[in-house]
Amino acid sequence: SFSRLCAEVGVLTPREVVVDLADPDCVPPTSADELGMEFPLVAKAAIGADYDRISFPGKRKIWFIDDAAELAGMWRSLKEAGYCSTFLVQECIPGDDTAMRSVTAYMDSTGELRLIGSARVLLQDHAPTMIGNPVAMITEAFPDLWEATGRLLRHAGYRGFANLDIKVDPRDGRELFFEVNPRIGRNSFYLTAAGANPMAVMLKDLVLDQRDEPIEVTRQVLYSLVPDGVIARYVSDEALRRRAKGLGRGIDPLRDPAERSLRRRVTI
């Protein structure tokens, strides 16, 4: 599992309990004593593809659970929807969206870290099925996170793109790795915006059999899918608001001068 691999190389993760709902004898835990963790808690599917196959009223990408009754209700909804896979219940780490970090890496076909970059999240989407997806970020170098990411991916024998979500615990400054997505992230354009096209790196490796020196993305840019006013209103950290404003207009991958469609422009 992800948490086991992290533990083997000294990478920190939140405490968690894995619940296998595919086991017909499984009785999902509902109390703090059963879980060994206090409420509030966070719950999510271990395998996103399995979760995407089901649909039910009130479905959420990530569940924030305040008490045993809410947890029991979640298990009931999953059972009624026919969900038969693993689910994770984790301790809830405090802190707002700005405590999140995104790391994108490419491990080439020889197993070496060929590209890495990262961003500080300003805002995330808060729609129930989209929660956790960043909508505004500042690209920034985080060498400690890069080193830990490389250590983890090499240990796993990983190849290809990986996108990792990390949160800094405001209580003690620990950097906790939440998950690794075994693909390039939906917001990976922040790398291109900062000067490193991940597709070019992949094509050189897999098509041309060429590997340049490893690329570390250090340029700072504002990557944003929302109007500047949204950042100004909802980012509570004044210093971060000033940083975002100082970087100028945000780079939005949806805005392309080559796209002439009036309908498209109105839509976005």
Which role does the model predict for each range below?
Residues 2-87, 109-111:
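Active-site nucleotide/adenylate-binding loops and adjacent lid/helix of ATP-dependent enzymes
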Residues 122-134, 181-195:
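Glycine-rich phosphate/pyrophosphate-binding beta-alpha loops
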Residues 153-189:
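Conserved metal-phosphate-binding beta-hairpin within the catalytic cores
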Residues 200-268:
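Peripheral (often C-terminal) accessory segments that flank ATP-dependent C-N-forming ligase machineries
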Residues 88-89, 159-163, 212-219:
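Flexible, glycine/charged-enriched surface loops at secondary-structure junctions
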Residues 64, 68, 186-204:
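Gly/Ser/Thr-rich active-site loops/lids in small-molecule metabolic enzymes
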Residues 65-127, 140-148, 168-176:
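Phosphate-binding site of ATP-dependent enzymes
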